[in-house]
């Protein structure tokens, strides 16, 4: 009968619609769970990267301090400092070989005036900009400082020159530049960017991100207020979990800001084959269910055969 055919067709349609809703709900639930898993993974990666960054800074500081202790214990260097002649001090540094390749050396008088500097931005007779911070760090037992010098971030350590009483103080600075950022990236799988801000003036940006991205990174790191909490954001069409670490412990207008970025899209790509397989299976199940519903609906509508 026609009403029976219409009823069974409606039942088949309702069942197909319900199945479609269930399949879609399961698919989007899996998709949401995948996104959350990737975000959690990125959060763990970001936290691990922050710890790696701190340990790498500590390791660099210890190495720097070891080299500085070796330098200040060198007799020819102490004699050159006692004489107070910049040329003799530089000659002793060249013979010693410490601090002339990847680090900068600052020999300071007890009054905080620069005697010798391998950084051209600081000249003899000039007051060292972080002299008070060095004194405060020494009193408080702080092993290293993170400062902004000549528009660049530096990791700074210090040691006195004694002969036998203190006659000078030597500071040695390790630049946090592209090489350091690349090393941190290789250890943490994070994108890393550094910028120094001194008295409100930003310095040069050092970043592992492509050059086309660096202008927007520098602009973001120069914001007057920095939120240190990790945030999800869209950056040049790609999703990142980002965190800004404000560094600098001198309280005299110098600050170093570090941007750590954990890419989400790259992690999501690893789940893309699983999503496609699940979607294909769901479509096959839906098509089979529709075909089965149509088949049984046709069987139910077939007229009964009369007995022979």
Predicted features by range, described:
Residues 4-17, 278-283, 296:
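Alpha-helical transmembrane segments and their helix-membrane boundary motifs
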Residues 150-160, 227-229, 236-248, 256:
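A short beta-strand signature within small-molecule sensing/ligand-binding domains used
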Residues 83-92, 98-101, 113, 117-148, ...:
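Extracytoplasmic/periplasmic sensor domains and loops in membrane signaling proteins
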Residues 105-112, 191-199:
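Short hydrophobic alpha-helical segments used for membrane anchoring or interfacial signaling
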Residues 264-308:
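Cytoplasm-proximal transmembrane signaling helix
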Residues 7-13, 18-83, 100-103, 145, ...:
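Juxtamembrane extracytoplasmic/periplasmic/luminal helical "stalk" adjacent to the first N-terminal
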């Amino acid at each position: 009968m026609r009403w029976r055919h219409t009823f069974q067709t409606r039942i088949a349609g309702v069942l197909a619609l319900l199945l479609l809703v269930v399949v879609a709900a399961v698919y989007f639930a899996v998709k949401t769970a995948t996104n959350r898993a990737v975000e959690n993974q990125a959060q763990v990666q970001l936290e691990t990267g922050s710890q790696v960054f701190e340990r790498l800074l500590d390791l660099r500081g210890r190495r720097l301090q070891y080299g500085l202790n070796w330098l200040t214990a060198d007799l020819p260097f102490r004699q050159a400092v006692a004489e107070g002649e910049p040329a003799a001090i530089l000659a002793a540094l060249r013979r010693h070989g410490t601090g002339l390749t990847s680090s900068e050396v600052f020999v300071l008088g007890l009054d905080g005036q620069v005697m010798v500097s391998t950084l051209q931005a600081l000249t003899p007779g000039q007051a060292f900009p972080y002299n008070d911070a060095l004194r405060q760090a020494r009193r408080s037992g702080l092993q290293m400082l993170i400062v902004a010098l000549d528009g660049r971030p530096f990791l700074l350590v210090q040691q006195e020159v004694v002969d036998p009483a203190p006659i000078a103080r030597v500071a040695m600075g390790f630049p946090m530049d592209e090489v350091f950022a690349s090393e941190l990236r290789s250890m943490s799988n994070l994108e890393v960017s550094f910028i120094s801000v001194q008295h409100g003036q930003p310095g040069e940006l050092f970043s592992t991100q492509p050059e086309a991205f660096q202008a927007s990174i520098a602009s973001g790191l120069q914001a007057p207020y920095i939120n240190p909490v990790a945030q999800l954001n869209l950056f040049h069409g790609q999703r990142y979990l980002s965190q800004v670490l404000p560094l600098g412990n001198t309280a005299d207008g110098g600050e170093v800001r570090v941007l750590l970025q954990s890419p989400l899209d790259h992690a999501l790509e690893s789940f893309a084959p699983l999503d496609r397989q699940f979607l294909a299976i769901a479509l096959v199940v839906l098509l089979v269910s529709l075909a089965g519903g149509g088949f049984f609906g046709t069987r139910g509508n077939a007229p009964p055969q009369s007995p022979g």
